[in-house]
Regions:
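Hydrophobic packing positions in regular secondary-structure scaffolds
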Residues: 1-125
Length: 125
């Protein structure tokens, strides 16, 4: 799917059509499209249309700055859904690469048990 088609579907609010098209795409391609979208609002709309599992996979393929923007803009529940789909080591990597002002939101979104594991992994050399 071309970036222009995505932009057109968002602008015309054809979200059902867009959601169906995204279903057939792989996560790496969706990540590239999100990186190419200039409009932050469009990125959020497209990301929110993804099923939970695909959103997690797409998130793991994104550039660090795009992930940071999404973390800031997603609700706590949405962020929890995305983080639940990541492998624990990916969550640790995410925490290590994010600025210190973003980390508390990530930690708040993961379960208490997962937070303990993350803390242990962060201590591991």
């Amino acid at each position: 799917m071309e970036i222009e088609e995505i932009k057109r579907l968002v602008e015309t609010k054809k979200f059902t059509v867009l959601k169906n098209k995204l279903q057939g795409m792989n996560s790496a391609d969706i990540s590239e499209i999100l990186d190419e979208l200039e409009d932050k609002e469009s990125v959020i709309i497209v990301f929110r249309l993804l099923p939970k599992e695909k959103a997690g996979m797409t998130f793991s393929h994104m550039e660090s700055d795009m992930r940071q923007k999404l973390i800031q803009d997603l609700t706590d529940a949405e962020l929890k859904g995305v983080l639940d789909e990541l492998f624990m080591d990916d969550t640790v990597d995410l925490i290590e690469e994010m600025p210190s002002n973003i980390v508390p939101k990530i930690l708040k979104a993961i379960s208490k048990e997962d937070r303990k594991i993350v803390n242990e992994l962060l201590k591991y050399p």
